[in-house]
Amino acid sequence: MWFKNLQLYRFTRPFEHDADSLEKMLQSHLFSPCGSQEMSKFGWISPLGKHAEVLVHEAQGQMLLCAKKEEKVLPAAVIKDMLQEKIDEMEAAQGRALKKKEKESLKEEILHTLLPRAFPRSSQTFLWINPAENYLVVDAGSAKKADDVLSLLRKCTGSLPVVPFALQNPPEITMTEWLNAGAAPGGFVLEDEAELRSALEHGGIIRCKEQDLVTEEIKAHLLADKMVTKLALNWSDTVSFVLADDLSIKRLKFSEELREQNEDVISEDHVARMDADFALMTGELAKFVPELVAALGGEKAE
């Protein structure tokens, strides 16, 4: 349950639903597995795991949701080969080239035949709502995946007035300033990874891993008008992460010292451990998010 990515969204007006009312709303889009002729299914499951039923877990005013997606895997190459074989057979038998609509119909028949035997794969995406501070966070590696979850939530609530966090200064400018200065402000520390992109269209990309970023070599790239588009950072010796120029946070890791604070919770009691971990994680992230935003220059005034 410990988040590995952060996509940050600001409510444009207060989130008015409590856990009980939201629970009822989510019932309209419960997850169920794909039927024999369905390509994908998307819905809500309990964030506390398969042995729990609650769809909204609340701890210290914070809410945790979980969306599950199941998709049938149909290799494109297999479909293409089967379709071409069918087309060749029919064109040879009829002595003419098939029309576009006929080919599309054949493809639908092939999909209809293959779907019941297709292997399903599933993924889960957690969503954290912080009503008191007026934002929500999706544990998704891409904005598209986060948007899918937000769209599902919007279907349940009727409306979801959220927008991505908007900063006064573009993150790439601030990160470039940090690297030029050789240090980040506050409790943030530069680590050993960065991506630098040229401001010019074909100016090149530099990716550094396991490298000291405070060197003349790196400064030379910055002097050549390259901007920092990804930067590995550490916050308060508690959280390490990679910050991107779209304000997305990936490869989020919490320190062992933090995670071990819940070692006294009985591990066999899965729900109790999830509850304790969620409270611990959100307690830390509730401090981390505003400090990061402040270090980056703050949000745009409304």
Swiss-Prot record:
It is found in: Cytoplasm, Nucleoid. The keyword Chaperone does not apply. Coiled coil: none annotated. NCBIfam families: PRK00321.1-3, PRK00321.1-5. May be involved in recombination. Belongs to the RdgC family. This is Recombination-associated protein RdgC. The lineage of its organism: Bacteria, Pseudomonadati, Pseudomonadota, Gammaproteobacteria, Aeromonadales.
